[in-house]
C-alpha cells in the first residue's frame, strides 16, 4: 500500500526525479542506488540491465519490466543510463539530495501571508533510498521467494545480512 502511495503521489516536479529513482531501484530487484546511477546506456542489453556491482564486482542481469522502462525513458541520459550523472563527477551528491527530499516529500502548503513560504509535511519522514532494497526483499519474502534467492539478488553472501533487510512485520 505504501509503495503505491509513493509511486502515485503527485510530487513537485523537482522531487519527482527522486521518487522515480526510488521506484526504479525497487523495480530492478532493489539495485543499489550507486550502482543504478553509474549504469551506462551500453548496460541495457536485450531488455535487460547487465552490470557488475561496484561493491562486490558480482555480475547481474536484471529484466527491465515496463514500469522500469518508463522511468528509464523519462530520465534517459547520454553518458549514463540516467541523466542525473551526465553533469556530476560523483553519485553521492545526488544520493544526498535524494535522501533529503525523500523524507520531505508529501503535502506542500504555501503561506500567502508569509510571501509564499512553503511548508512541507512529509508522508514518510524516515524514507531513505535504501528502503527500496528493504521493501523489495520484504515483498519477495512475503511472496515466499526463498531467502537464498533474495540474498543472491541483493548480493549478500551471509544470510544474517539479508535478514536485516526483510521486515517480518509484513508477514
Regions found by a protein language model. Give the residues of each.
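C-terminal catalytic core of Y-nucleophile DNA break-rejoin enzymes
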Residues: 56-73, 79-104
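Short, basic (Lys/Arg/His-rich) helix/loop patches that form interaction surfaces
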Residues: 8-14, 99-152
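Feature representing long, continuous alpha-helical segments
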Residues: 4, 26, 34, 38, ...
Amino acid at each position: 500500500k505504501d509503495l503505491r502511495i509513493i509511486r502515485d503521489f503527485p510530487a513537485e516536479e523537482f522531487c519527482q526525479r527522486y521518487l522515480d529513482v526510488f521506484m526504479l531501484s525497487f523495480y530492478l530487484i532493489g539495485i543499489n542506488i550507486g550502482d543504478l546511477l553509474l549504469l551506462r546506456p551500453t548496460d541495457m542489453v536485450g531488455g535487460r540491465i547487465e552490470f557488475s556491482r561496484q561493491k562486490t564486482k558480482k555480475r547481474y542481469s536484471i529484466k527491465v519490466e515496463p514500469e522500469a522502462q518508463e522511468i528509464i525513458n523519462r530520465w534517459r541520459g547520454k553518458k549514463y543510463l540516467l541523466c542525473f550523472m551526465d553533469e556530476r563527477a560523483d553519485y553521492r551528491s545526488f544520493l544526498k539530495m535524494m535522501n533529503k527530499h525523500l523524507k520531505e516529500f508529501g503535502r506542500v502548503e504555501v503561506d500567502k501571508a508569509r510571501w509564499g513560504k512553503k511548508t512541507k509535511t512529509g508522508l514518510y519522514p524516515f524514507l531513505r533510498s535504501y528502503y527500496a532494497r528493504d521493501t523489495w526483499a520484504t515483498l519477495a519474502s512475503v511472496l515466499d521467494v526463498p531467502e537464498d534467492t533474495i540474498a543472491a539478488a541483493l548480493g549478500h553472501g551471509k544470510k544474517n545480512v539479508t535478514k536485516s533487510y526483510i521486515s517480518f512485520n509484513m508477514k
